[in-house]
């Protein structure tokens, strides 16, 4: 028998077959017949241990087990004992004791060496030889070997080794379990299914709970939920131990598959079955069930499961809490959303920005901006951390309530926290500057926005055009208009209306007509705001034909006239003496639609007569 390590060189001298092996790194151990001489050479000592053949056992008793070398301490102790003549006999006995380790240790080290040296084909050959001699290693070694092959992407070797290990029932199960787990990690679910099918084809081999867990996980990942349920029924029929560590995962997977198949109530029955059998529930199981019932808007069941999970300290999924919050928002139970936040805080679960913005936005739409602001301030007192979207909603609420100082303070706080590229927040602040006639602040904000790498959108351009148009600063408005087009931001209806309105105030009516024609060429749809401006423009410029075309387009597009617009158009036609056009206008836009004044109706009737 030869032993070699980093500091050992061992030589075995046999009467017929001398063996020697040296390795600077890894030890390899071979089984040989009884040695006559055993020479130990070490960097620390060089001694010879002579065995007395008279005391050697008979051939019948010559059973040398496999040897597992001890740690470096064993080398040091043996060397020290061999130096002293008085302890040489003791060292021999100590060495014999060391050889009495498990008989499979040598196989483990040989396999470990072949794996580390990447000798895959030789590894398969060794395992086949071990099968021939019925000396396969234990289940743990086989499982580690399979995991190593999959980790190094040696899938052909993996399947070859699995075929070798299937000769032993216990090894077949443990090795297949390790293989399926490895394939699932690599998302090779078809390979997992293949391994499970071959395992079931083996005679007298029953898959373990772990094998069922891996195969159910694979089918769930590829969307075969019906197959998961079938395997679960098969698992229960096998009467395997429900107290296995994989049982909780198995029940979680089947509940998830049932919920995804729209069978949430059956999943709830499976949960009750778990409780009856004493299988501990997991946070993933509760999360999946709560999400399923929240999406189905089953409020009572969702509340029950949510409270149950909170009582068992299994609230660990913020996404599930978001589903519950959205359910309450859709149902209009806004106050209950605050209870969800309180439960999350109690469970030390972070309240995400998605949850906060859903709550604040829900209050804003259903209860008004004042309530939304109160909820936001309450959340901040609860030490919830707002994100970019929540900040934007709160800033908009403050602006709508005309609390401009708070809106600006909140915007500054938002920028300091690093949320300096939120276009919606910039738009709200820009609109606020326009309403408060702070044109210079708006221009500075635009410059900062560009400096921070945030591109202005159509809302910001519209706000700037509108505020400069109202201030009669047409040069600045035209500059912004051209900049918007250079940035390839297409003008919308509001953009054109603001520009036309600005030029109308400055009495540049021809420019108004040019912009209107450009708007119509771009297939813009007329609204009452633009129609009101253009009726006045066409009337002032005596463009009666274009006025009639405008009114006809409005009728075709279904745009309704208000009293002011109706009166303006009617007066323009009357001044031009176009009675037939007046009659058409009255027939096309009746008094019920326009809600015109009694004075206008009376005056128009007198004109027709």
Curated annotation (Swiss-Prot):
Main subcellular location: plastid
Range of the transit peptide: 1-44
GO biological process terms held by the UniProt record: chloroplast organization
Pfam families, per database record: PPR, PPR_2
Molecular function via GO: mRNA binding
Record bears the keyword ATP-binding: no
Record's GO cellular component terms: chloroplast
PPR repeat positions: 103-137, 138-168, 172-207, 208-242, 247-281, 282-316, 317-351, 352-386, 387-421, 422-456, 457-491, 492-526, 527-561
InterPro entries: Pentatricopeptide_rpt (IPR002885), TPR-like_helical_dom_sf (IPR011990)
Family: Belongs to the PPR family. P subfamily.
Protein name: Pentatricopeptide repeat-containing protein At5g13770, chloroplastic
């Amino acid at each position: 028998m030869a032993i070699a390590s980093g500091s050992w060189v061992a030589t075995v001298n046999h009467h017929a077959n001398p063996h020697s092996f040296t390795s600077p790194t890894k030890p390899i151990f071979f089984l040989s017949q009884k040695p006559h001489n055993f020479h130990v050479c070490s960097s620390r000592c060089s001694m010879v241990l002579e065995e007395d053949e008279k005391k050697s056992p008979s051939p019948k008793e010559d059973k040398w087990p496999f040897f597992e070398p001890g740690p470096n301490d064993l080398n040091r102790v043996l060397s020290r004992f061999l130096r002293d003549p008085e302890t040489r006999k003791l060292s021999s006995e100590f060495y014999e004791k060391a050889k009495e380790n498990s008989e499979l240790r040598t196989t483990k080290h040989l396999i470990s060496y072949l794996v580390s040296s990447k000798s895959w084909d030789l590894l398969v050959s060794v395992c086949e030889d071990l099968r021939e001699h019925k000396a396969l290693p234990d289940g743990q070694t086989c499982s580690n070997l399979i995991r190593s092959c999959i980790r190094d992407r040696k899938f052909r070797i993996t399947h070859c080794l699995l075929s070798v290990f299937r000769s032993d029932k216990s090894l077949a199960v443990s090795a297949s379990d390790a293989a399926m787990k490895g394939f699932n990690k690599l998302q090779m679910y078809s390979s997992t299914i293949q391994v499970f099918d071959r395992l079931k084809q083996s005679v007298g081999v029953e898959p373990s709970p772990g094998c069922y867990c891996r195969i159910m996980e694979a089918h769930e990942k590829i969307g075969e939920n019906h197959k998961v349920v079938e395997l679960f029924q098969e698992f229960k029929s096998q009467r395997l131990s429900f107290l296995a560590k994989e049982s909780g995962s198995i029940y979680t997977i089947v509940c998830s598959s049932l919920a995804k198949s729209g069978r949430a109530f059956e999943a709830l029955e499976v949960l009750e079955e778990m409780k009856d059998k004493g299988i501990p529930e997991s946070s993933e199981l509760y999360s999946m069930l709560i999400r399923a019932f929240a999406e189905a808007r089953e409020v009572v069941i969702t509340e029950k499961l949510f409270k149950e999970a909170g009582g068992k300290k299994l609230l660990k999924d913020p996404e599930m809490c978001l589903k519950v919050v959205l359910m309450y928002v859709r149902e209009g139970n806004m106050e209950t959303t605050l209870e969800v936040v309180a439960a999350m805080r109690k469970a030390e679960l972070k309240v995400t920005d998605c949850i906060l913005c859903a709550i604040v936005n829900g209050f804003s739409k259903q209860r008004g901006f004042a309530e939304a602001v109160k909820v936001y301030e309450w959340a901040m007192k609860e030490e919830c951390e707002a994100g970019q979207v929540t900040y934007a909603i709160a800033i908009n609420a403050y602006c709508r309530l005309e609390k401009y100082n708070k809106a600006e303070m909140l915007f500054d706080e938002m920028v300091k926290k690093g949320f300096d590229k939120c276009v919606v927040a910039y738009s709200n602040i820009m609109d606020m500057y326009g309403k408060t006639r702070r044109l210079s602040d708006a221009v500075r904000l635009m410059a900062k926005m560009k400096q921070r790498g945030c591109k202005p959108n159509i809302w910001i351009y519209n706000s700037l055009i509108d505020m400069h148009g109202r201030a009669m600063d047409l040069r600045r408005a035209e500059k912004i208009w051209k900049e918007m087009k250079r940035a390839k931001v297409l003008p919308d209806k509001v953009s054109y209306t603001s520009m036309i309105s600005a030029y109308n105030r400055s009495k540049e009516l021809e420019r108004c007509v040019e912009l209107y024609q450009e708007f119509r060429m771009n297939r813009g749809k007329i609204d009452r705001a633009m129609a009101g401006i253009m009726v006045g423009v066409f009337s002032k410029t005596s463009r009666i034909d274009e006025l009639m075309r405008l009114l006809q387009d409005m009728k075709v597009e279904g745009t309704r006239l208000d009293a002011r617009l109706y009166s303006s158009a009617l007066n323009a036609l009357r001044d031009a003496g176009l009675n037939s056009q007046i009659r058409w206008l009255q027939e096309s836009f009746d008094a019920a639609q326009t809600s015109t004044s009694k004075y206008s109706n009376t005056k128009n009737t007198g004109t027709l007569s």
